[in-house]
């Protein structure tokens, strides 16, 4: 007979075996984190931010519509329209107010035109093969938005019981919404769906997206995708937004690192830190929007010329050939040298500028090299170790036989570099002039201050 201890051990073993048998076979298999599907048309897309107020002398949708063929020829794919809604009057800033102080989520700002004008703009964009996303302000409204009178309980209140602008910022022209209220969530989602159905909008850039609960955005994305595949850009810098809500997010850390390098406050290590975090901590499907200018920076921090100085061309090129979703802010192609006024009419002065040719060539180059496409279609960056690692950024992006080798001298001194490992070896064509070049571990490359070399396998 078995002793009691032996019987107990046998029983425990039997239970363990039974438990293992009941365990699903994929218990330890990796599970996908990102559940949303990017629209197929975003795979190699370039974003273009259009500030209707300043884009043309007229400042209207109709005038902007006439410029769409030019934007198509430039090569951009997605037009991001800054908010199109009527602007609040109460506590308004400046003469015309901030477009981010929304008075009516279902209305069109008469400053820009009518709903028919907006629909005409979108229809023309679609005929040209472009897509249009709207800037959406879900975090707050103008003081005189009708929701304030109809649903005062949908708003945040401070310790005194008064309506509360977003804390700590000088946003006195707006008051915050309270997303603990299901009625508000339904209203806001329905308003977004209205623009997709009524005006043919293809998605949204969501202002201060991280100030609104993520579960709201995830549900809104599901309801929007049920109408048609949409593209969603979050003004936020957090990986979780990519799980089920947003295709793309702001690469604030990239922009700050590049600006610090240009100002002599950091070296290439700042970019190492950014790219390391993206590859180690962010989902591979996350599109990180890289840019050298947007409306906030231009208005409040300085033009791209002020922020990047002699490093600007290299910064622009890196935003296109490194990992990321490139953005062009209207006027960059004309080398706009001014800080555009935010609350007044201040039209861009359009002129011929080398930036236009640079953007056009970069876009064509990027589209012809799938290794440079947006996540998850493009390739990850593989660092290439060089002899000046604090001054020169060098990397390879390679996928399915397509290979791009890029070098950036991010310093004010000439550099001559060699390479100590082999991912860069190969025969290339230079982006700058089409010349052929062979790279081996014995090769040295000379780089002028703040210059770049972008080399690609011929296609």
Label for each model-derived stretch:
Residues 24-46, 53-62, 66-77, 82-199, ...:
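Substrate-binding/active-site clefts of carbohydrate-active enzymes
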Residues 22-31, 35, 190, 197, ...:
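Active-site-proximal helices and loops of the catalytic beta/alpha 8
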Residues 46-49, 78-83, 133-134, 203-205, ...:
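Structural recognition of the beta-strand scaffold that forms the well-ordered cores
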Residues 439-459:
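C-terminal beta-strand-rich structural cap/linker in extracellular carbohydrate-active enzymes
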Residues 289-354:
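Aromatic/acidic polysaccharide-binding cleft in carbohydrate-active enzymes
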Residues 50, 71, 81, 105, ...:
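Conserved, mostly hydrophobic/aromatic
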Residues 407-411:
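Asparagine-centered strand-capping/turn motif at beta-strand->loop junctions
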Residues 6-16:
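Bacterial N-terminal signal peptides
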